[in-house]
Amino acid sequence: MSERIGVIGAGSWGTTLANLLARKGLDVTLWAYEAELVEEMRATRVNSLFLPGIELAPALSFTNSLEEAATGKDFLVLVSPSQVMRGVLAQLAPLLRPGVVLVNASKGIELDTLMTMDQVCAAVLPPEVARCFSVLSGPSFAREVSLEMPTAVVAASGDPAVAAAVQRLFTTPSFRVYTNTDVVGVEIGGALKNVIAVAAGISDGLGLGHNTRAALITRGLAEMTRLGLSMGAQPETFAGLAGMGDLVLTCTGDLSRNRTVGMKLGQGMKLADVLGEMRMVAEGVKTAESAYRLARRTGVEMPITEKVYQVLHEDKPARQAVMELMTRDLKAERW
């Protein structure tokens, strides 16, 4: 393979994906916002800020210039936080040629517009560029992927040929990629699982046990599915890696930033203090508000999401939120 690849965003996930591709001997340029981080990675071959202890492949190069990262590339992997993605895409737009395959690896819903990342891309980029959009998602902690622990994810695109190209690009003996054409479902699954992970963390922080966590995961999946279906997603997507798979991992794994936020809230910390301790973005904090507003706009019932929003943004006590969920009107189980 002789593809030239740019990766936009040098957090833990962006660095991991860039390193995965560079380990295959591909020509990969990783863009970081912080100039000092670029210099450190060049000098030490380690991203000590976001992925400490992982040696970066010799084939991986680093830049603080979006022009250098994006110009002339065959694939551009987008790993900027979802709330700044629009601004990054606006800067990239004049640099991108038709035919470049865009791979979104960020998980969130834009707060101001309630758009998913594919919708943001379509709004900002010329149609001849945006048509090659894809999304890479699934249960994949960056550190485990970096350590080459077996991982399976999904590459989704409305164009099956684009999805297949992304599948071929990223697949390694330890990183298995499936294809899908349900971009909406994969994006909603990736975004909403972070909100439910905050809820699971709150439950763990309160010491409520495994029964509670299992209920939150199951009913959280129902909320994700209902919202996705209202937006045109396919129901089977939510039973797959980008739905149930990512949800289970993020709600149970100790490496989950969103679960960690919830756990500390459940233990009594204030949100500002929790976020002040974190170097990396917990997408579920902003996505909780986006999803809550999207549910109200679409008329989709999402009680767990509503309570997470209230705990995060209206200072509702965590234990009160749990009790309000448990004392809702009785009803039949439904999706």
Curated annotation (Swiss-Prot):
- This enzyme's EC code(s): 1.1.1.94
- Tell me which UniProt keywords the record has, alphabetically: Cytoplasm, Lipid biosynthesis, Lipid metabolism, NAD, NADP, Nucleotide-binding, Oxidoreductase, Phospholipid biosynthesis, Phospholipid metabolism
Q: Name one GO biological process term.
A: glycerol-3-phosphate catabolic process
The pathway to which it is assigned is: Membrane lipid metabolism; glycerophospholipid metabolism
Q: Which residues form the active site?
A: 193
Enzyme class label: oxidoreductase
Identify the SUPFAM superfamilies for this entry.
6-phosphogluconate dehydrogenase C-terminal domain-like (SSF48179), NAD(P)-binding Rossmann-fold domains (SSF51735)
Q: Which domain of life is it from?
A: Bacteria
Tell me one GO molecular function of this protein. NAD binding
**What coarse category fits the chief subcellular location reported for this protein?**
cytoplasm
Any Pfam family from its record, for instance, is NAD_Gly3P_dh_N
InterPro entries, per database record: 6-PGluconate_DH-like_C_sf, 6PGD_dom2, G3P_DH_NAD-dep, G3P_DH_NAD-dep_C, G3P_DH_NAD-dep_N, NAD(P)-bd_dom_sf
**Gene3D superfamilies, alphabetically?**
N-(1-d-carboxylethyl)-l-norvaline Dehydrogenase, domain 2, NAD(P)-binding Rossmann-like Domain
Give residues annotated as binding sn-glycerol 3-phosphate.
Answer: 107, 138, 140, 193, 246, 256-258
Which subcellular locations apply to this protein?
A: Cytoplasm
Q: Which reaction does it catalyse?
A: sn-glycerol 3-phosphate + NAD(+) = dihydroxyacetone phosphate + NADH + H(+); sn-glycerol 3-phosphate + NADP(+) = dihydroxyacetone phosphate + NADPH + H(+)
GO cellular-component term (any): cytosol
Per UniProt, where does NADPH bind? 12-13, 107, 142, 257, 281, 283
Instruction: Describe the family membership recorded for this protein in Swiss-Prot or TrEMBL.
Output: Belongs to the NAD-dependent glycerol-3-phosphate dehydrogenase family.
Its function? Answer: Catalyzes the reduction of the glycolytic intermediate dihydroxyacetone phosphate (DHAP) to sn-glycerol 3-phosphate (G3P), the key precursor for phospholipid synthesis.
Protein name per UniProt: Glycerol-3-phosphate dehydrogenase [NAD(P)+]
- Show the taxonomic lineage: Bacteria, Pseudomonadati, Thermodesulfobacteriota, Desulfuromonadia, Geobacterales
Q: What is the primary gene name for this protein?
A: gpsA
